[in-house]
């Protein structure tokens, strides 16, 4: 198992928040944890070429740009097989039950989730999305320990 943390050293603007990107290579599959900028994404593709990976899985911890902004490049390059992330739209009925103040509806909850989680929502027609709550085994020996659904 090899874990590589990408840094902004040598990037066009290393002072900018280039975000996170961690590569987890178990020897037969590559898992990318977040991809905060396009320069990270370019390095991911280089790594994949050097290690003969045509596809990788990606775990997106959350919606923020510094974790997301390199993902469109990876999709454009066709290198992602699946993205594991929070699929809150799937749980809109449960969320409504928890926050039901008689002012919200299922539709308003769905619209609000789509607004707040716009980056994740934008992926829904471009790549296979997996639920981080239920699909926790990403690859051999690579598991998502949390968050759990109660979080």
Where are these regions (language model features)?
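Generic serine detector
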Residues: 7-9, 15, 28, 54, ...
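Conserved residues at beta->alpha junctions
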Residues: 35, 62, 146
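Flexible, acidic/histidine-containing loops and adjacent segments that form or flank the divalent-metal
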Residues: 1-6, 68, 73-151
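Active-site metal-binding motif and surrounding structural segment of the metallo-beta-lactamase
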Residues: 29, 38-90
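Conserved beta-strand hairpin/beta-sheet module of binuclear metal-dependent hydrolase folds
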Residues: 1-51
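Detector for Asparagine
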Residues: 17-18, 26, 63, 100, ...
């Amino acid at each position: 198992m090899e874990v590589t943390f990408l840094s902004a050293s040598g990037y066009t603007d290393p002072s900018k928040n280039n975000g996170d990107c961690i590569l987890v290579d178990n020897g037969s599959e590559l898992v990318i944890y977040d991809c905060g900028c396009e320069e990270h994404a370019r390095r991911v593709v280089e790594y994949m070429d050097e290690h003969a990976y045509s596809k990788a899985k990606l775990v997106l911890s959350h919606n923020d740009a510094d974790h997301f902004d390199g993902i469109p490049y990876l999709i454009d390059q066709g290198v992602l097989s699946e993205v594991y992330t929070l699929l809150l739209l799937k749980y809109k009925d449960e969320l409504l039950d928890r926050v039901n103040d008689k002012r919200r509806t299922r539709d308003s909850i769905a619209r609000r989730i789509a607004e707040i989680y716009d980056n994740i929502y934008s992926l829904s027609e471009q790549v296979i999305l997996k639920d981080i709550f239920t699909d926790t085994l990403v690859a051999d020996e690579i598991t998502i320990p949390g968050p759990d659904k109660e979080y």
